[in-house]
Regions:
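Residues that line or immediately flank small-molecule/substrate-binding pockets and catalytic motifs
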Residues: 40-43, 93, 129, 218, ...
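Active-site acidic/histidine proton-transfer and metal-coordination neighborhood
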Residues: 66-188, 198
C-alpha cells in the first residue's frame, strides 16, 4: 500500500504560520513517511531575509493563481533533500465559470498548475469542478474547459484527478459521467473517503473504478481505533475490489496532534489492507 501524507493534515500549523509548505516534506519524512501531497493554497511567499526587512522590503502579496517561483524552488529543493516523493499537487479550481475574465483566469490558473506540477515532478493534479449540484449548463462549461486544458496536461505527462467535493462533483454519478466523457488515461477521480452526501458504499462503488488518487480522510477515532464517521473497512474493500494500486493520501482533519491523527489513519488503512 502506497501511503502518502497530505499537507492538509497540518492545516492548523500552516494557517497559524508555525509551518510553511516548503517544510512539509521534511515534516512528513520525520514522521516516517516517504510520500507527500502538497496544496497550492499554502504556497505563501517566503519573507525577505533579516537585512532586507531592515531596509523595508516585504514579502510579495500572496496570489494563489500566480505561483511564486522563488517559493516553488524552495518547495522543490526541500522535497528532494527530504527524500520524499510528491504524489500530487492539489489546487482548488472551478471549471464551471461563465465566459469572461473569470473563465480566462481559470484557464491561466490551470495552465500555471500544470507547469508547477511538472516543475515539482508531481505526476498528477487534484482539482475540483466547482459549480452547483445538478446544474447541467455548468456541467457543459466544465466539459468545454477541460477539453481545452487536458491536451496541455497530456503534453507535460501530468494527470488530472477530480475530487468528489462540493458542487457538481458532489454527485458520484455526475463525476463518473464527467470522467467517462473523455475516456483519457490522463483524467480520473480523486476519491475522498469523507466527501459523500448520501450512501457512501454506493458512491464508492461508482467512483472507485475511476480513481487515480485517493484521500483517506479522518477526524476522530474511538477506543478501538476506528474512525467515528467513516467505515474504513468498507472504503479499503471498495478500493481492493476496483483493483486500485495508486497512492492513498492521508488527510487528517482533526485538531489534535497531526502525528497521532496521521498514525491512527495509517493504522486503519493497514488493518484492512
Amino acid at each position: 500500500m502506497d501511503i502518502a501524507v497530505s499537507s492538509w493534515s497540518f492545516h492548523d500549523e500552516l494557517y497559524q504560520g508555525k509551518l510553511r509548505l516548503a517544510d512539509v516534506p521534511y515534516r512528513v519524512h520525520d514522521l516516517g513517511y516517504g510520500a507527500v501531497e502538497l496544496q497550492d493554497m499554502f504556497l505563501w511567499p517566503r519573507p525577505p531575509n533579516l537585512i532586507a526587512r531592515l531596509f523595508g522590503k516585504k514579502a510579495p502579496p500572496f496570489n494563489q493563481y500566480q505561483h511564486d517561483r522563488r517559493t516553488l524552488l524552495k518547495v522543490r529543493l526541500n522535497r528532494l533533500r527530504s527524500g520524499t516523493r510528491l504524489v500530487c499537487w492539489t489546487i482548488d479550481s472551478d471549471l464551471t465559470v461563465s465566459e469572461g475574465p473569470d473563465r480566462q483566469k481559470q484557464k491561466a490558473y490551470l495552465a500555471a498548475a500544470i507547469e508547477t506540477a511538472d516543475f515539482l515532478n508531481a505526476p498528477l493534479i487534484r482539482m475540483t469542478l466547482g459549480g452547483e449540484k445538478n446544474d447541467r449548463s455548468a456541467y457543459g462549461r466544465a466539459v468545454e474547459l477541460m477539453s481545452s486544458v487536458l491536451p496541455v496536461a497530456m503534453a507535460r505527462k501530468v494527470k488530472f484527478a477530480v475530487e468528489n467535493h462540493d458542487g457538481l462533483s458532489s454527485d458520484p454519478a455526475v463525476l463518473a459521467e464527467f470522467v467517462q466523457h473523455f475516456h483519457s488515461p490522463y483524467l480520473g477521480v480523486c476519491m475522498d473517503f469523507g466527501n459523500f452526501e448520501g450512501d457512501r458504499a454506493s458512491g464508492m462503488q461508482t467512483l472507485a473504478p475511476h480513481a487515480i488518487h485517493v484521500h483517506a480522510k479522518s477526524r476522530e477515532f474511538n477506543a478501538q481505533g476506528e474512525e467515528t464517521q467513516i467505515d474504513y473497512r468498507m472504503c479499503v474493500d471498495a478500493l481492493k475490489s476496483a483493483g486500485y494500486a495508486g497512492a492513498i493520501s492521508i488527510e487528517y482533519e482533526g485538531h489534535d496532534d497531526p502525528a497521532i491523527g496521521i498514525k491512527r489513519t495509517r493504522d486503519l488503512l493497514e488493518r484492512y489492507a
